[in-house]
Structure formats: structure tokens, C-alpha cells
């Protein structure tokens, strides 16, 4: 049976959020019994344009990946003073670095854990917040470099990944739901935002009832994503 309150199927667990920033030293053996199935939510992996990009990835061999998530924090929650929400306050777990963990989650899904990572972050805009509003990363993989830009102060919503390849660039625009190919062709994957969550739950229920081994996003991998998001190198 499914327990919607706990996100569980027959004793198997779907964690709805990532680990908190102070849990990077967590010993997972203390949290899960041996053989326990577990899956940490990663909704951007399940959106239509991401699935389309992932299908093409084996033949692309990109030299570089450029990732951006830029938006204006005061517009996140219409009718709510942005200065009062957790995002604005470091002590409440806010800051663009941890708020936008999904970018590192899908990068790890596409390319794995980088060999080396550098991260610079801080508060640079005139927003009335004490959390970081800008976080920039450079990551080195065996065959490519990745650039990641996260901010709270961009006017207009931009969320995309661009892959630079031998035949040109491929741009997956998550806001528009489109994939632009090197020849200018635009493929459309617009869909209701809830569709990604439906796909994710379909996977989880199937895994819980019939799957074996680790899930596609086990807690150990999610913990590594958290470490990368915080700018830590993962061995």
C-alpha cells in the first residue's frame, strides 16, 4: 500500500527532500537498515526536456557544459515578503547555493561526480538578505569542464544547460521546455510541471514493488550531491 503522508510503499522510503547542509558527515548505516530500499527525490531528472537530452547524450561527447539558474528572489512567492522566508536567511537554511541543489543533482545524473571542483559564493546584490545570492562553480571531469551559475537576482527566469559539442551546441531550456539543436531546430517538450513528479512517483512505486538493488538516486549519491553543492570535493 502507498502511504502518501510518508512517501512509502510497503516499508520502502521516498525521501521528499535532500539532506540538510549540516549533514554531510552523516553515517548512512545509522539511518537505514541493511537491505532497505530508499530513493531521494530528484524531480528535475524526470522533466521531459531532461529526458530528451539524456537520450541524446551518449552520442554527443561534449567538451563543456554551461549551467545557469537565475531568477529574482522577490518574485518567487507572489504576495509574500521575500525578506521573511527561509531563502533570505542563512540561519534558516537559505542561500542560493543550497536552494538550487537541483542543478548539481542533474549534472551528477548526466556526468557523474567531477574529479575536481571550485566554488565561489557570497552576497553581492542589493537584496535585503544575509544568505548568499550568487554561487559559481567550475568542475573538471575526465573529458569536459562544467560551469555552474546560480543566483537570486536575475530579472527574468533562466534555467538551462548548454552542451558544447563537435557539431555545435545543444541547449536544454527547462523554463521553456525546449531543446535547441546545433542547426537551430527547436524540439518541444512543454508539459504540466506536475508531469515530472508523476514520472518520479511511477518510478518509485515500480522500484519499491518490483525493483532490486539500489535505486537510481540512493541516499549515498544524494549525500555526495549535497557535498558538491556546498563546494566540497568528493572522492
Annotate each language-model stretch with its function.
Residues 1-45:
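Beta-strand-loop-alpha-helix segment that lines the small-molecule cofactor/substrate pocket
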Residues 5-7, 203-235:
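C-terminal helix-rich "cap/oligomerization" subdomain common to oxidoreductases
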Residues 47-118, 125:
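Predominantly a Rossmann-like dinucleotide-binding segment in NAD(P)-dependent oxidoreductases
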Residues 49-50, 103-107, 198-205, 226-229:
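A general structural signal for well-ordered alpha-helical segments in protein cores
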Residues 91-98, 187-195:
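A short glycine-threonine-serine/GTX helix/turn-capping micro-motif
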Residues 98, 104-176, 201-212:
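Contiguous beta-strand/loop segments that form the cofactor/metal-binding neighborhood of enzyme cores
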Residues 153-155, 178-180, 185-187:
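Short, surface-exposed beta-strand-loop junctions and turns on beta-sheet-rich folds
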Residues 190-202, 217:
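Active-site loop of classical SDR/Rossmann-like NAD(P)-dependent oxidoreductases
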Amino acid at each position: 500500500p502507498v502511504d502518501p503522508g510518508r512517501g512509502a510503499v510497503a516499508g520502502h522510503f521516498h525521501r521528499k527532500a535532500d539532506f540538510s547542509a549540516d549533514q554531510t558527515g552523516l553515517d548512512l548505516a545509522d539511518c537505514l537498515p541493511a537491505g532497505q530500499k530508499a530513493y531521494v527525490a530528484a524531480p528535475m531528472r524526470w522533466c521531459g526536456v531532461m529526458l530528451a537530452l539524456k537520450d541524446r547524450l551518449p552520442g554527443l561527447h561534449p567538451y563543456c557544459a554551461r549551467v545557469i539558474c537565475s531568477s529574482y528572489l522577490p518574485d518567487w512567492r507572489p504576495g509574500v515578503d521575500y525578506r521573511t522566508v527561509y531563502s533570505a536567511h542563512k540561519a534558516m537554511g537559505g542561500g542560493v547555493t543550497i536552494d538550487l541543489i537541483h542543478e548539481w543533482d542533474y549534472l551528477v545524473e548526466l556526468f557523474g561526480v567531477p574529479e575536481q571542483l571550485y566554488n565561489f559564493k557570497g552576497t553581492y546584490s542589493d537584496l535585503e538578505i544575509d544568505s548568499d545570492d550568487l554561487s559559481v562553480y567550475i568542475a573538471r571531469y575526465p573529458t569536459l569542464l562544467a560551469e555552474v551559475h546560480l543566483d537570486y537576482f536575475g530579472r527574468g527566469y533562466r534555467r538551462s544547460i548548454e552542451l558544447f559539442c563537435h557539431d555545435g551546441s545543444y541547449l536544454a531550456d527547462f523554463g521553456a521546455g525546449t531543446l535547441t539543436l546545433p542547426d537551430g531546430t527547436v524540439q518541444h517538450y512543454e508539459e504540466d510541471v506536475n508531469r515530472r513528479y508523476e514520472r518520479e512517483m511511477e518510478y518509485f512505486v515500480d522500484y519499491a514493488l518490483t525493483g532490486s538493488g539500489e535505486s537510481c538516486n540512493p541516499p549515498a549519491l544524494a549525500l555526495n550531491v549535497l557535498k558538491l553543492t556546498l563546494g566540497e570535493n568528493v572522492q
